[in-house]
A protein has these predicted regions:
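Extracellular adhesion/carbohydrate-binding repeat motifs centered on closely spaced tryptophans
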Residues: 1-330
């Protein structure tokens, strides 16, 4: 199409017909003044889109290669733009298709990597790809290194040469000389974690604990000298540690206070050692018989250091008046 004025002169440049703008291309050397149609055209350093009828387009414009966005004056936007409450990036550095919307990819922009959905919207938060997970901040920037997300620690591996920033979910990984342990969902393990060989404990920093740890009011020993499984929790046994014997229950807790075994009761002091002889517990006297492996005496008479004492069924030493059969004792 061409347009001539009333005098028969060929018109070129912008032309408003009704409410619609058209462009008559005076620089078309083969067909000067031909109306631009069904194309993207650079005019005075700006890009414009025209539909098949030649009408200048505004808003979102779909072409075979993807989407563009034009302002109300028809000029394509480039760079970051918030459209309809979402962020898009129209790539002015795309040599083949200038100002084409970035979609369905990771893209480095001014040194920072961003994620874009197939719809072109910038994404934030967790992003899943075939190789695994990445994370982007609320402003869209891909992050690297340690990150606390919803009170859990994750490591986005900046040293992964194939997939920089990929979330680590290996069972263990050495980072800056320290070994850390991760769940399958990528969260750094803190606290107790069970493996086929037994239990381990990771400190709040994520470092596997060795030696003594007090957890929820109980003492545990993580055996750093276990050559096969360093840091494995000691359970259900006695163990000599620094020349002192300690006793551990099936859950690994060091025995403290009353402990029942094979129908007999024993008492372990706060240091983890079995009490022997007389023991006052909460104002009540008990006798842990050193001649019988420190078992608590209960339910009868017992001579201690030449004197007779009576212990009831709970092991408590009787005081004041005591009826035994038809006899009374004091």
């Amino acid at each position: 199409w061409y347009l001539y004025d009333e005098a028969g002169n060929l018109k070129t440049g912008w032309c408003l017909q009704g409410n619609t703008w058209y462009y008559l291309d005076g620089e078309n050397t083969e067909h000067p003044g031909m109306m631009a149609a069904d194309q993207i055209k650079e005019i005075n350093g700006k890009y414009y889109g025209f539909d098949a009828s030649g009408a200048m387009q505004t808003g979102w414009i779909l072409r075979e290669e993807g989407w563009y966005y034009a302002q109300v004056d028809g000029a394509f936007v480039n760079g970051w733009n918030n459209i309809g409450g979402a962020w898009y990036y129209l790539d002015g550095n795309n040599a083949e298709h200038p100002e084409l919307m970035v979609a369905g990819q990771q893209k480095v922009i001014d040194g920072t990597t961003y994620f874009f959905a197939e719809s072109g919207t910038m994404k934030s938060g967790w992003q899943q790809y075939p190789e695994g997970w990445y994370y982007a901040t609320p402003d869209g920037a891909k992050i690297y290194g340690w990150r606390n997300i919803n009170s859990e620690w994750y490591y986005l591996d900046e040293n992964n040469t194939e997939y920089p920033g990929l979330m680590v979910n290996d069972p263990e990984k050495t980072i800056d000389g320290t070994t850390y342990y991760f769940n399958a969902d990528g969260a750094m393990i803190r606290g107790w974690k069970q493996y086929p060989e037994g239990w381990y404990y990771q400190d709040p920093s994520g470092v596997r604990a060795t030696g003594w740890r007090r957890v929820d009011g109980a003492w545990y020993y993580l055996d750093g000298d276990n050559e096969e499984y360093p840091g494995l929790l000691v359970t259900d046994c006695s163990k000599v540690i620094n020349g002192v014997t300690y006793y551990f229950d099936k859950a690994g807790a060091m025995r403290e206070g009353w402990y029942a075994e094979n129908g007999a009761w024993y008492y372990y002091n706060e240091s983890g050692q079995p009490a022997s002889g007389w023991k006052n517990v909460n104002g009540t006297w008990y006798y842990l018989d050193p001649q019988n492996n420190n078992k608590m005496v209960s339910g009868g008479w017992k001579v201690v250091n030449g004197s007779w004492y009576y212990f009831n069924g709970s092991g408590a030493m009787a005081k004041n008046w005591l009826a035994a059969g038809s006899d009374w004792y004091y």
